[in-house]
């Protein structure tokens, strides 16, 4: 709250379209600097993208909700309260698949708002990353009415849009727009969004623009932009050209950035690994290791004595293990945890006899057997025989150590595999147990779509796979 720093508004749920996205429980408010919190509603929003508090009236708050990813409906759109969160009114958005992914406020006029809508839907089979309801909008009356901004912008289906306003010249706006087939462009307006000019074909990449696309304008230099991406892209000329920001000794997958008003060399960046801080405009970075924010997919335990160890695969931070307890006076510390694999870690499994044997995997079933004594990690992923079709591995492929025979493993692609020697060799014990359907023939956004629509193929998980096994 710009009027009271002890008041904090918090939106829950990640604003991305990923298969591993975490959903939220609405909007929370703290009136004591974060010591305690109260849920203020919008529990069906699932993914809050941004919150803005009125600079002169703390009772007025705007909340941008992207809404559920896996289903229609929910509380999606732009919501406004005039009584500090007791009641909410939806002021923008109407489609059952369309939410608001970004909002801005004019620093000179709090009644002037800008909003970006995003139409998207993910199923187990596919991701439709855009649609005709994605776009840019402007309000001159605090969000009560809106005008869609079109002049100079592409008329095709659009995906995720990031918007920024120049602190030096607030009539100047910037927009990073995802277009079809994960292409995109950066646009600039010098007249409050009434007309736009294409500056470049720059768009976030890697797993897809749905995972990034946040755009920021520097408060210290006009036309300096930061576009969130695997590696941050920065422009000094309003989006005409972009270069990669220096990110030595820093994690990738960037999602947010903050600045200090009186320090042009300061950057604070949020990534898939946590928070990084720079005091010299990205020449060097400081990593804050003490935040308990690691996201685990699955966990497993071994039978180590006197304290068993816990192992788990994490989102974009590998697979790790650590003790359940310790007899050290300081208790369990970061240093007690150790990494056993990189990439996205997923399911882990342990050997009930040999506590130094752990199984872990990367995304798409890249299974390893790890010896904790030697540190050796051996790739043991089953492979198809000559002449067989390729294996379809789930993003989070299931691994099972038999409770009856510890050297026996089960692993699954579209078929079930069995090993009798801890993964040194494998035999398939089933055929294809899936329907082997064509994913793009299945309904999404409530109906079937043509092949030329806004499919985000790169961001889709392998389909027609087995997701769990038991014995």
Regions found by a protein language model. Name each.
Residues 1-471:
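Beta-propeller blade termini and top-face loops
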């Amino acid at each position: 709250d710009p009027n009271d720093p002890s008041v904090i508004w918090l939106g829950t749920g990640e604003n991305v379209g990923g298969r591993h996205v975490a959903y939220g429980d609405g909007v929370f408010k703290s009136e004591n600097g974060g010591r305690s919190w109260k849920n203020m509603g919008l529990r069906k929003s699932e993914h809050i993208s941004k919150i803005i508090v009125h600079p002169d009236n703390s009772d007025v708050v705007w909340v941008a909700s992207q809404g559920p990813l896996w289903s229609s409906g929910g509380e999606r759109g732009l919501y406004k309260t005039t009584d500090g969160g007791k009641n909410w009114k939806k002021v923008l958005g109407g489609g059952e698949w369309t939410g608001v992914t970004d909002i801005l406020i004019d620093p000179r006029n709090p009644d002037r708002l800008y909003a970006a809508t995003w139409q998207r839907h993910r199923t187990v089979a596919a991701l439709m990353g855009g649609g005709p309801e994605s776009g840019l909008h402007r309000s001159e009356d605090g969000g009560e009415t809106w005008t869609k901004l079109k002049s100079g912008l592409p008329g095709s289906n659009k995906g995720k849009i990031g918007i920024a306003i120049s602190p030096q010249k607030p009539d100047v706006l910037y927009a990073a727009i995802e277009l079809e087939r994960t292409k995109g462009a950066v646009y600039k307006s010098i007249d409050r969004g009434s007309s736009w000019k294409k500056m470049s074909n720059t768009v976030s990449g890697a797993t897809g623009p749905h995972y990034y696309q946040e755009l920021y304008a520097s408060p210290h230099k006009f036309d300096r932009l930061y576009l969130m991406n695997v590696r941050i892209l920065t422009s000094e000329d309003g989006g005409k050209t972009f270069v990669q920001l220096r990110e030595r000794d820093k994690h990738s997958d960037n999602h947010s950035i903050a600045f200090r008003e009186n320090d042009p060399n300061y950057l604070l960046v949020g990534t898939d690994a946590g928070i990084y801080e720079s005091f010299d405009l990205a020449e060097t970075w400081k990593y804050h290791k003490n935040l308990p924010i690691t996201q685990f997919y699955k966990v497993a335990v071994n039978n180590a004595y006197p304290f068993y160890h816990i192992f788990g695969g994490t989102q974009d931070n590998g697979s790790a293990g650590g003790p359940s307890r310790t007899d050290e006076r300081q208790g369990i510390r970061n240093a007690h945890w150790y990494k056993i694999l990189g990439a996205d870690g997923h399911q882990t499994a342990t050997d009930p006899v040999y506590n130094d044997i752990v199984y872990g995997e990367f995304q798409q079933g890249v299974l390893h057997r790890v010896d904790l004594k030697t540190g050796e990690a051996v790739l043991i992923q089953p492979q198809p025989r000559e002449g067989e079709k390729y294996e379809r591995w789930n993003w989070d492929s299931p691994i099972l150590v038999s409770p009856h025979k510890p050297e026996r493993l089960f692993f699954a692609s579209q078929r079930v595999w069995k090993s009798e020697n801890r993964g040194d060799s494998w035999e398939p014990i089933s055929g294809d147990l899936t329907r082997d359907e064509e994913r793009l023939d299945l309904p999404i956004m409530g109906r079937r779509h043509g092949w030329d629509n806004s499919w985000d193929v790169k961001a889709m998980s392998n389909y027609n796979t087995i997701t769990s096994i038991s014995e």
